[in-house]
C-alpha cells in the first residue's frame, strides 16, 4: 500500500519556554501512538518532533492513506450447545442477530478448546481523513499542561492561543478541524524575519521551507546544537569557557526561532562583586551566558542569543548591555549594603524568621545546630569550637539584601561575608558548604568541620520535621526529607559514625516533649530504607538486602561489605551455603529455650562433632578478618565448612526427642549462624 509522510503543525502564540521541549515531544509521541493504534503505520511509527516558540509540529514517515482491510471473526456459542433437534437454539439466534448475520452465513471455527459458531467478514479500512481528527484531538488532550487558557470568543482551551493548523499527507491537505481551526497548508515563519504566509508544498519539505522561507529552525534539537556550537566557538575565540548548565541552554533554545550568538560586555568594576552573584543574575534574569577565563574566574564579557539577524547587531548588543548594567548595579548595591553589618550582628533578626511554627524560628534552630555540630565534630576528631561557630553563622545570610534578592545564594554569600568579618577560612567554607549535598550527585562538604555542620543541618531538619508529623508520603515531601536522608547517608559512608547515635543527638537537642517519642526509631528505619534505595543503584537487590539485614550503624564499610558479598555469591559453594543458612534460621525459630553455649559432651554423632570442630576453627579466622575489614576473606572462609554443613543436615536429626540433645544441636547451629552471618545475612542471597 502506498505510504507518504504526514505533517501536523499547530501555529501558536509564544509557548512557555521551560515547557516547550516537553510539549513538543509529548505531542509528537501521542500522534505517533494514535497512528499506530489506528494501524495507519506498519509497526512502530518513525517520527520527528518539532518545537519552536510559536509552533508544535510532528512529521511521521510512511503513513497510509487508508487503513488496510481487516478480516474480523466474531465467535459465538459452542457447536455442541447451538442446535437442538436440528433447530438453532436461542443462544445461536441471538448471536446471529447481534452480528447482523443470518444463520446460514455463520461458519464453524475452533477456538483452541472447542468448535464454535462464528461470523467472519471483511471490515473495509477507513481513510486517514476520517481518523486523523480524533487522533490529533486526543494528542492535544494528553499534553502535560498544568494551566490552560481560552482566547477570543472560542470555547477551546490550550496552553496558548492557536492560530493555524497545517495537516499534510504528502502534498495533500487532510481536512480536519482541531481547536476550532480548519486544516490548511499555510503557516507563518519568523515574526520579524519572514514576510507573509508560507505554503508548505509537501510534508517532507517542512523543515527546509521553514528554514529557507520562514527563517525558523523548527527542530528544538537542531537549534540547541547550533546554539551550543556557536557559544563554544565564540568562547574559544576569547580563550574562555561558557558558564552554563543544560537548563539554561534548553530555556534559551525555547526562546528563539533563528538563533544568533552575539558577544557583549560590562564594566570591569562589577567584578568586585562575588562572581556567583553576577553569574546568577546574568543566567537567571537575562538568560545570558557568562564567560570564565582559564582559571575559572568570571570575565567582563558574556554571550547572548538573539532571535534577530541584522547586518549591524551593535544596537542589540548595546541594548542588552544597558539592561544588564542596571541588574549588576543592583547586585553591587546589595553587596555594599550587606557589608555594613557583620553576620554576628544579624543573628537577632533570625528570631523573626519562622522555620516552622511548631518548632520555632531560625534563631532557635541555630542553637540546636550549634550543639549537634559540636558533638559531631568531636566524634570526627575535628575542631568542635570551629564547627559550633560555623553553625552559629550558617543561617545569618538569610537576612541579607543579596540573599533576599537571590535565595539561591544562601550559604555562598555567608562565606563571603564571613571572610570579610575576619572568620577563619575553615569556618567560612563550612558556612557555604553546610547545604551540601543539595541534590543527587552534588559534591560533599570538604573537611570535617564543614561535614559536621552539614550533618547537623540535615539531621535537625529530618528529626524535627518528622517529629512534628510531617512525614513524606507518596510524591509529597515538602521539606525534602528524602533528600536530607540521602545527603546524611552519603556523608556517613565516608565517616565511621553511628547513624542511630547521631539521630538521638539531634532528637535530644529539641525541647523535651516537643517531638513524637517514636521519632528516633522511625527516622532510623527511614534512613535504612533510603540507604537501600541508594545502594540499589549500584548493587543487586538481594546483595543489598543481605548486608542491610545486619542493620549496620556505621556506614563507612557498607560498600566493602557489598563488594565482598557480591564476590562470595560467585563462589561455587555460595548457593548451597545460602540455602543451609536459611534452613538454620528456620530451625532456630523453633527453639524452646534461650540459645547458649555448645556442650561437647552432648555431641553424639560424628557429623555434629565434625561441624562443631569446623565451627571452632572458623570462629577466630572470621573474627580476625572482620576486625581488619577483610570482609571478602571472612566470607570466603565459609566455603571451607560446606562439606561439614552438608553432612550434618544429611545425617543428623536436629529436633531430637531428647530435649537436651535437641537444645545442644540448636546451640551448635546458632554458633554456625553467627559466623555465617558475621558480614551479611547470606540466606537472603538469590531471593
Curated annotation (Swiss-Prot):
Entries under HAMAP family matching the protein: Gly_tRNA_synth_beta
GO cellular component: cytosol
Catalyzed chemical reaction(s): tRNA(Gly) + glycine + ATP = glycyl-tRNA(Gly) + AMP + diphosphate
Family: Belongs to the class-II aminoacyl-tRNA synthetase family.
Coiled coil residues, start to end: none
GO MF terms, alphabetically ordered: arginine-tRNA ligase activity; ATP binding; glycine-tRNA ligase activity
Stored InterPro entries: DALR_anticod-bd, Gly-tRNA-synth_bsu, Gly-tRNA-synth_heterodimer
UniProt keyword annotations, A-Z: Aminoacyl-tRNA synthetase, ATP-binding, Cytoplasm, Ligase, Nucleotide-binding, Protein biosynthesis
Protein name: Glycine--tRNA ligase beta subunit
PANTHER family: GLYCINE--TRNA LIGASE, CHLOROPLASTIC_MITOCHONDRIAL 2 (PTHR30075:SF2), GLYCYL-TRNA SYNTHETASE (PTHR30075)
Alphabetical GO biological process terms: arginyl-tRNA aminoacylation; glycyl-tRNA aminoacylation
Entry's localization field: Cytoplasm
SUPFAM superfamilies listed in its UniProt record: HD-domain/PDEase-like
Gene name linked to the record: glyS
Subunit structure: Tetramer of two alpha and two beta subunits.
EC number in record: 6.1.1.14
Domain of life where this protein originates: Bacteria
Amino acid at each position: 500500500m502506498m505510504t507518504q509522510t504526514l505533517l501536523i503543525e499547530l501555529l501558536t502564540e509564544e509557548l512557555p519556554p521551560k515547557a516547550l521541549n516537553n510539549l513538543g515531544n509529548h505531542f509528537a509521541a501521542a500522534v505517533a501512538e494514535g497512528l499506530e493504534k489506528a494501524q495507519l503505520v506498519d509497526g512502530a511509527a518513525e517520527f520527528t518532533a518539532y518545537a519552536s516558540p510559536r509552533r508544535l509540529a510532528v512529521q511521521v514517515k510512511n503513513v497510509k492513506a487508508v487503513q488496510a482491510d481487516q478480516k474480523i471473526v466474531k465467535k459465538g456459542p459452542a457447536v455442541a450447545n447451538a442446535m437442538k433437534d436440528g433447530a438453532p437454539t436461542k443462544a445461536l439466534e441471538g448471536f446471529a442477530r447481534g452480528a447482523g448475520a443470518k444463520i446460514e452465513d455463520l461458519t464453524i471455527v475452533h477456538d483452541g478448546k472447542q468448535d464454535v459458531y462464528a461470523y467472519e467478514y471483511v471490515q473495509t479500512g477507513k481513510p486517514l481523513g476520517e481518523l486523523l481528527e480524533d487522533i490529533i484531538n486526543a494528542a492535544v488532550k494528553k499534553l502535560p499542561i498544568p494551566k490552560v487558557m481560552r482566547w477570543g470568543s472560542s470555547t477551546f482551551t490550550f496552553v496558548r492561543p492557536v492560530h493555524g493548523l497545517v495537516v499534510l499527507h504528502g502534498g495533500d491537505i487532510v481536512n480536519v478541524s482541531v481547536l476550532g481551526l480548519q486544516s490548511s497548508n499555510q503557516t507563518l515563519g519568523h515574526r520579524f524575519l519572514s514576510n507573509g504566509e508560507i505554503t508548505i508544498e509537501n510534508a517532507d519539505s517542512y523543515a527546509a521551507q521553514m528554514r529557507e522561507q520562514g527563517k525558523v529552525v523548527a527542530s528544538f534539537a537542531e537549534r540547541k546544537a547550533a546554539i551550543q556550537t556557536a557559544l563554544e566557538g565564540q568562547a574559544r575565540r576569547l580563550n574562555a569557557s561558557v558558564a552554563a548548565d543544560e537548563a539554561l541552554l534548553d530555556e534559551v533554545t525555547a526562546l528563539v526561532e533563528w538563533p544568533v550568538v552575539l558577544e557583549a560586555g560590562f564594566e570591569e568594576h562589577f567584578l568586585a562583586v562575588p562572581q556567583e552573584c553576577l553569574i546568577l543574575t546574568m543566567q537567571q534574569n537575562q538568560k545570558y551566558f557568562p564567560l570564565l577565563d582559564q582559571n575559572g574566574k568570571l570575565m567582563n564579557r558574556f554571550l547572548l542569543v538573539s532571535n534577530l539577524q541584522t547586518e549591524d547587531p551593535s544596537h542589540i548588543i548595546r541594548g542588552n548591555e544597558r539592561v544588564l548594567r542596571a541588574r549588576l548595579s543592583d547586585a553591587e548595591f546589595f553587596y555594599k549594603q550587606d557589608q555594613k553589618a557583620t553576620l554576628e550582628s544579624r543573628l537577632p533578626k533570625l528570631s523573626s524568621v519562622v522555620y516552622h511554627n511548631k518548632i520555632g524560628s531560625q534563631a532557635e534552630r541555630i542553637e540546636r545546630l550549634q550543639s549537634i555540630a559540636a558533638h559531631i565534630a568531636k566524634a570526627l576528631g575535628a575542631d568542635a569550637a570551629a564547627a559550633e561557630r560555623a553553625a552559629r553563622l550558617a543561617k545569618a545570610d538569610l537576612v541579607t539584601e543579596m540573599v533576599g534578592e537571590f535565595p539561591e545564594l544562601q550559604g555562598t554569600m555567608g562565606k563571603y561575608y564571613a571572610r570579610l568579618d575576619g572568620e577563619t577560612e575553615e569556618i567560612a567554607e563550612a558556612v557555604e558548604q553546610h547545604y551540601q549535598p543539595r541534590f543527587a550527585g552534588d559534591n560533599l562538604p570538604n573537611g570535617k568541620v564543614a561535614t559536621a555542620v552539614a550533618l547537623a543541618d540535615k539531621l535537625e531538619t529530618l528529626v524535627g520535621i518528622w517529629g512534628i508529623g510531617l512525614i513524606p508520603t507518596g510524591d509529597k515531601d515538602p521539606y525534602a526529607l528524602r533528600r536530607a536522608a540521602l545527603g546524611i547517608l552519603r556523608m556517613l559512608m565516608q565517616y565511621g559514625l553511628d547513624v542511630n547515635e547521631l539521630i538521638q543527638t539531634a532528637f535530644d537537642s529539641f525541647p523535651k516533649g516537643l517531638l513524637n517519642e517514636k521519632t528516633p526509631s522511625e527516622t532510623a528505619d527511614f534512613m535504612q530504607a533510603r540507604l537501600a534505595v541508594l545502594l540499589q543503584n549500584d548493587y543487586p537487590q538481594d546483595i543489598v538486602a543481605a548486608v542491610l539485614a545486619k542493620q549496620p550503624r556505621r556506614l563507612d564499610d557498607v560498600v566493602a561489605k557489598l563488594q565482598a558479598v557480591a564476590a562470595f555469591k560467585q563462589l561455587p559453594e555460595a548457593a548451597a551455603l545460602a540455602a543451609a543458612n536459611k534452613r538454620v534460621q528456620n530451625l532456630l525459630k523453633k527453639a524452646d529455650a534461650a540459645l547458649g553455649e555448645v556442650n561437647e559432651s552432648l555431641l553424639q554423632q560424628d557429623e555434629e562433632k565434625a561441624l562443631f570442630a569446623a565451627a571452632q576453627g572458623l570462629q577466630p579466622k572470621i573474627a580476625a578478618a572482620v576486625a581488619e575489614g577483610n570482609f571478602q576473606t571472612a566470607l570466603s572462609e565459609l566455603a571451607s565448612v560446606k562439606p561439614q554443613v552438608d553432612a550434618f543436615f544429611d545425617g543428623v536429626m536436629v529436633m531430637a526427642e531428647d530435649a537436651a540433645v535437641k537444645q545442644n544441636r540448636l546451640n551448635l547451629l546458632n554458633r554456625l549462624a553467627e559466623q555465617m552471618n558475621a558480614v551479611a545475612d547470606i540466606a537472603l542471597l538469590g531471593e
